[in-house]
Amino acid sequence: MKRIFSTDLPDKLPGRLVLFASSILAFLAGTTVYLLGRDWATTQFLSPVSAWQPELQVSFGFLGANLPSLCHAYTFTLLIILALWPARHARVTGAFSWLFVASALECLQAEAISDAVVIGTSWFVGSPFADGLLAYMTNGHFDVADLAATAVGVSGAFVATSILEEKT
């Protein structure tokens, strides 16, 4: 019977499952910090359900502001790398693609950039994509620490997959 996948798949499967599990744990940790440490009324996708926010609001300090960005970057970079894994340059492609996307979305929240995008997208006002993008830019705020957390999360996923590749 001819194999569809790479011949080394069964040997590397346990390590890939560990990486997948670590991405899920990181996602849950980031989501927990995000939900417990932020005001839902000021969060774009949570504002419709802000009345349901628990009264207990935990302060995570510096971690509360940037841990969700780090976990988000780690999780999505790792999932992209795992999805591309049989490809020769999966780690580099996955890491740089998510770093580009996350950094671009963060930079869109910078006032100078968002002002230019608002002017450029004025023709498309009323379309769901343009309205969503404009709401994201105006409700969010640019934070260099989020860019740094994204870089650390992407680097962590890159290193984790590098270690797996060396061990198997």
Segments predicted by a language model, with ranges:
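Bulky hydrophobic segments
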Residues: 1-168
